[in-house]
Amino acid sequence: MSKRHNSADFLSILKKHGITKLYHFTDRDNLDSIVANGGLYSWADCEDRSIAIPKPGGSNSSRILDARYGLQHYVRLSFTPKHPMMFVAMNDGRISNPIILEVDLDVILDETTKFSDRNATKNGAYIGDDIEAFKCIHFNSLKADTHFDLAPEEQMFFQAEILVKNHVPLSAIKNLASFGISLSKSAVKRASRIPSTAQISRQTPTAFIFLVDHSVSMERMI
């Protein structure tokens, strides 16, 4: 990782707003592949590496939009474990047993990481890779429990994104132990295989293992 020269400025903003981790939602059935391949890859990098995704969170239309805007090689992370697109993916049947992976803030400090003030493929999204782009994120809106708690004109900013180039390594995923996975210096070991189920709805949005992708794109609004 090529670390930013002004990393302290980014960390200061995160500390000011009480942000300690990032999140990525995926399906429980994808976890074995994530571990076996050493972390989270963008869907395009998965294709390049012939990595099969058992239950992809993104739709075909979202992939088309990603490619159109040059975002296909980025892993999407969010600031919330209750990402609206997780529920969309569930309703569409793409995922059925969602889990949330928690990701270390250090990925923000990589010079290749980009930031978007809303879903990166949505009309009007401000995307950049510097401190000014980072400051455009509506951090106060991220403090809401869900996007429904925000005014309609502010709800889009609840989906602010961290776009990590190509790959989030296993070492950056902080809650693997919650899934019975332990990391050693030389290998990732499957400690146990404990089935987990989850029932998530708008009424019970937290009834799952809090472990964070977001990696689903919304269609660009015209």
Report the location of each language-model feature:
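Phosphate/oxyanion-binding active-site loops and adjacent basic polyanion-contact surfaces
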Residues: 77, 222
